[in-house]
């Protein structure tokens, strides 16, 4: 659920403090699993494209030097809400990440361009989204691609699917030397400690 207009500013300021404290690049909003709206909670408003846009706008206002990204699946990225308080979407969303099989760079909303949008999204555990298509992304002017959920035990497949990264960046993807297990902050050596 998305904060009401009054509390969106407070929530955005809190996010900004976390980004500062942990030296994060920014935030990515994803309303894929939003819960049922609770009209008895004064901190929440009925989910809408306008409320989502307000949250992104207030977040960018609270931390203009940080990235505000959205996962383009439900209300977080919509042609219905591209202006907040007279400020256009390009000023409060930095990156739009498409769902698997969807390409928001083909028809960006408001004054966003393909450069702010992912042209391809890949999910590594389930294998959805295909292999990276670097030349297609270059040709259509996409600024980003997204890879989600690489797991150390599946790195071989991840590297294979990302082999076209050379087309985008001029060099191959480098294998990691360290990985972390679920709920464990211990650095493990890759691939020696996979067992």
Describe the function of each predicted region.
Residues 99-107, 119-195:
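Substrate-binding cleft of secreted/luminal carbohydrate-active enzymes
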Residues 33-35, 72-76, 102, 151:
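Active-site-proximal loop/turn and secondary-structure-junction residues that shape catalytic pockets
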Residues 2-4:
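Short, small-residue-biased leader/transition segments that mark boundaries at the very start
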Residues 12-46, 146:
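Active-site groove signature of glycoside hydrolases
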Residues 12-19, 49-60, 134-135, 159-166:
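Generic structural signal for well-ordered alpha-helices
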Residues 49-83, 93, 97-98, 121-124:
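Aromatic-lined carbohydrate-recognition surfaces of secreted/lumenal glycan-active proteins
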Residues 25-30, 67-71, 94-99, 117-120, ...:
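Structural recognition of the beta-strand scaffold that forms the well-ordered cores
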Residues 6-20, 76-89, 126-138:
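Short, acidic/polar
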């Amino acid at each position: 659920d998305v904060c009401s207009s009054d509390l969106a500013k407070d929530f955005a300021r809190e996010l900004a403090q976390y980004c500062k404290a942990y030296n994060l690049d920014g935030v990515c909003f994803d309303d894929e699993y939003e819960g049922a709206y609770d009209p008895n909670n004064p901190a929440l408003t009925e989910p809408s494209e306008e409320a989502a846009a307000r949250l992104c706008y207030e977040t960018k206002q609270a931390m203009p030097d940080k990235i505000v990204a959205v996962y383009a699946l439900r209300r977080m990225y919509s042609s219905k809400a591209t202006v907040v308080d007279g400020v256009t979407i390009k000023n409060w969303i930095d990156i739009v990440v498409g769902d698997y099989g969807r390409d928001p760079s083909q028809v960006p909303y408001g004054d966003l361009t393909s450069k702010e949008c992912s042209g391809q999204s890949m999910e590594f555990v389930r294998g959805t989204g295909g292999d990276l298509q670097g030349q297609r992304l270059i040709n259509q002017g996409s600024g980003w691609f997204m890879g989600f959920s690489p797991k150390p035990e599946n790195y071989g497949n991840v590297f294979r699917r990302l082999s076209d990264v050379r087309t985008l960046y001029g060099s191959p993807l480098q294998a990691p030397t360290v990985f972390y297990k679920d709920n464990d902050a211990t650095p493990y050596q890759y691939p020696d400690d996979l067992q």
